[in-house]
Structure formats: structure tokens, C-alpha cells
Design a protein with these regions (language model features):
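Basic Arg/Gly/Lys-rich low-complexity intrinsically disordered segments
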Residues: 1, 69-70, 292, 370, ...
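Conserved helicase RecA-like core
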Residues: 2-383
């Protein structure tokens, strides 16, 4: 079935066509008819399945139809997401779908000035995409009312729970009309997610898209056994061998991300960085530069990269192995998209062996090891452009010993 055959307005069809869509993906094919009918939906699907368009297309159509009939002002659809980047990305999809309609969508997140957001809300917004923190700030200050919301969407719900937003989500229910449509999307499902989902949805249609292979066949997986303190040298070596390829390096924490950036700076390698501690404008600029190819190296934390569309990534480097197997799948899902080929390279320290075991168990196969001999290992360290403290002290001593007599005389005269 083609999008042109769906019972949606011509304006929305035109927007979808402009996005280059002709036929729906599995999640879109199964979700859109149910959402159009007003059903609650519980969707289990991973990133990269077309999930955002699965709810954006029917919701824009729904809001647009009500505007034609003469709706009252106010937010009609609330979309809650875990991260700023995901909010911005979803906003872009809504913007594209609604391009030829009068529907107004807007993303509100922390990390940016609040006044422009308030100004935008006052002008009128139909679809609001938001992270919990900034939303509650605006509600408590009286700038945001949700009493006209007729559709609630939770996207990346599993990640929201990981980040501790359970009480925030529960708290929002009391501020929403009881009679509403609820769409709940998650990449994974477990007891806690089920509990939350069924507290929100009513007689929901459950849609689960489970690929036979949890990871793309277009991705080749490799591991290299590396001492924790030597990972930066191996990354430098990898970058030198793949200077023209777009590389995404994933780490566990913000501190770790900053350390990797500093390590690359010391050897003259340009890099971009995104994590939760950065201002939103900085994160947006970094993503824009990386997508444009202005810089070929992006260092990110799991949280900041989750759900974000980063096209044309050729190599994903697991600088640290993720704590959860599911995060390995999300990480390497950044490469090998569509018909493109990709590589996932994991630097594994001795203490990370149990994590690697769990990942291989999940994949159902051993990951190919890039074996490095002791000689090759030492060569990688020796060829690094980073100088050790001992090297720097030796260089200073050498410079002092070879300092010109004329310069020494000047320094003596200054002391006098």
C-alpha cells in the first residue's frame, strides 16, 4: 500500500511525498491505520524503523482536520521524549509532514533561553515536543497549559525510565484530560515498561516489530584487546588509517567524553563532542558540523546519541563497552543503514570481558578479534604524537642545554 492510498488529507500527503516517502515501513503500515481510527497504540520498535513518521503522519492529519473545522487554541498533542536531540529531530519530522498545512509544532527543551520559548507558546502551538524538565518549569510558572491535549505520545519510553523520569511521567497524567489518545513507543519491553504502558493506554493495540537479526547485516563487528589507558593511542592509530571516513566514538560518561576529546587535541586531531553537560546550542552546532562533514570525528555519550539521526557514519567505535547489551545494538545502529556498509570496532580492556561475553551471547556469535602482537602493540604506542611527561621533561632539559649563549646572557642581566 502506498501513502497516496491512505485516508489522509492531500496537504499531508504532499508533505510526506516531499520527504521522499512512497511506501510505509512495517511500523508505519501497522500503526498509522490504528492511530487514524483513534486507537491507543503500544509500539515496540527500534530506532531506524521509521517510528517517528508512524505517529507524526496521522497526528498532523488529525490536528489539521480539526483546525479546518475550527478548533480552539491550545496544545493539542504532547510528545514526551528523553533527550534534547531527540526532541529536535522529532520536531524536524513534524515540520516536514506539516509543511503544506497550518499545523504548528514546536520543540521545548532545557539548555536554551526560556523567554523565546514562552514567546513561541504564546503565539500558538498545536503539537509540543518536550523533555520533562523544561516542560514542568513552564507549567509551574503558568506559561503552559495542557487541558486541551487530546493526544499524548511517549517516545523512547525505555530510555525515559533509564533516566529516572518515571515519576515525572506519572505526574503529567493529572494535568491531562482523561479522554485522550495515548501512543506509547519503546525500543525494548520489560515488566517496568509494561507497568507504565498499561497505566497510560486503554485497550491498546500492541504492535511489535522484531527483526530476525537484532543488528544490521551490513555491519562488520570487530574487537581489539587494549589496556584501558592505551585506548587513546589505538583510537589515534585508527583515525590515521581512516582519515577520510566519518567516525562516531561512543563512551559511557560525560567525563570520559571530555578526556577523549582532550587526548585527541594533544595529538592534533580535530573532534566534535555531544553530551548532556553541553549547552543545547553547542550540541546542535556539533551535530550540524558532523552531518555536513566539516569534522569527521564525533565523540558522544549513549544518552546524547540515543535516537539521534546521524547519517553516513562509516565506523562506530565502542571506546568503552556499554553496560547494557541493548545499548550495543543502539550504538552500532548508527552505521550500516539502508544499503550502506559499516564497521563496529570495540576497544576491550581486561575488566570489560564480562560485558563482551554478554554482547556475544546476545548476538549468538563470537565477534571477530583484530589480533595485535606485542610488537605491533608497542609500535602503536611509539608512533603516537602524544608525548609522555618523561618525554616533555627530556625535551625541556634538551632545550635548556642547547639554549644560545646570547639568550642566557640576557636572562642573567635581567636577574641583576
Amino acid at each position: 500500500m502506498k501513502f497516496s492510498n491512505y485516508p489522509i488529507t492531500e496537504e499531508v500527503k504532499k508533505g510526506v511525498e516531499g520527504m521522499g516517502f512512497s511506501k510505509p515501513t512495517d511500523i508505519q503500515f501497522k500503526s498509522i491505520p490504528a492511530i487514524i481510527k483513534g486507537e491507543d497504540v503500544l509500539g515496540i520498535a527500534q530506532t531506524g524503523t521509521g517510528k517517528t513518521a508512524a505517529f507524526a503522519i496521522p497526528i498532523v492529519d488529525k490536528v489539521f482536520r480539526s483546525s479546518i473545522k475550527g478548533r480552539k487554541d491550545g496544545v493539542r498533542c504532547l510528545v514526551m521524549v528523553p533527550t534534547r536531540e531527540l526532541a529536535q529531530q522529532i520536531q524536524e519530522v513534524f515540520k516536514s509532514v506539516s509543511k503544506f498545512t497550518t499545523v504548528k509544532s514546536f520543540a521545548i527543551t532545557g539548555g536554551v533561553e526560556q523567554d523565546p520559548q514562552i514567546h513561541k507558546l504564546n503565539k500558538g502551538v498545536d503539537i509540543l515536543i518536550t523533555t520533562p524538565g523544561r516542560m514542568y518549569d513552564l507549567i509551574s510558572q503558568g506559561h503552559l497549559s495542557l487541558n486541551r491535549v487530546n493526544t499524548l505520545i511517549l517516545d523512547e519510553a525505555d530510555r525515559m525510565l533509564d533516566l529516572g523520569f518515571y515519576k515525572d511521567i506519572e505526574g503529567i497524567l493529572g494535568r491531562l484530560p482523561k479522554h485522550r489518545q495515548t501512543l506509547f513507543f519503546s525500543a525494548t519491553i520489560n515488566a517496568k515498561i509494561k507497568k507504565l504502558a498499561y497505566s497510560l493506554v486503554n485497550n491498546a493495540i500492541r504492535i511489535q516489530i522484531s527483526p530476525k537479526d537484532p543488528v544490521s547485516k551490513n555491519v562488520r563487528h570487530y574487537v581489539t584487546n587494549v589496556e584501558m589507558d592505551d585506548k587513546r593511542y589505538f583510537l589515534e592509530n585508527l583515525l590515521e588509517q581512516n582519515a577520510e571516513r566519518k567516525i562516531l566514538v561512543l563512551v559511557r560518561t560525560q567525563v570520559r567524553a571530555e578526556r577523549v576529546v582532550k587526548a585527541m587535541e594533544r595529538v592534533g586531531v580535530d573532534s566534535l563532542i555531544i553530551h548532556g553537560g553541553k549547552e543545547q546550542s553547542e550540541r546542535n552546532s556539533a551535530l550540524k558540523a558532523f552531518k555536513a562533514g566539516d569534522c569527521m570525528l564525533l565523540i558522544a555519550t549513549d544518552i546524547s546519541a540515543r535516537g539521534v539521526d546521524i547519517p553516513d557514519v562509516e565506523i562506530v567505535v565502542n571506546y568503552d563497552l556499554p553496560d547494557l547489551v541493548e545499548n550495543y545494538v543502539h550504538r552500532i545502529g548508527r552505521t550500516g543503514r539502508g544499503k550502506q556498509k559499516g564497521e563496529a570496532i570495540s576497544f576491550v580492556a581486561e575488566g570489560e570481558a564480562p560485558l563482551l561475553f554478554e554482547i556475544e551471547k546476545f548476538l549468538g556469535k563470537k565477534i571477530q578479534e583484530i589480533e595485535v602482537s606485542k610488537k605491533e602493540y608497542q609500535t602503536i604506542l611509539d608512533l603516537s604524537n602524544e608525548k609522555s611527561l618523561g618525554d616533555l621533561l627530556s625535551q625541556i632539559e634538551f632545550d635548556l642545554e642547547n639554549e644560545s649563549p646570547k639568550k642566557k646572557r640576557k636572562q642573567k642581566n635581567k636577574k641583576k
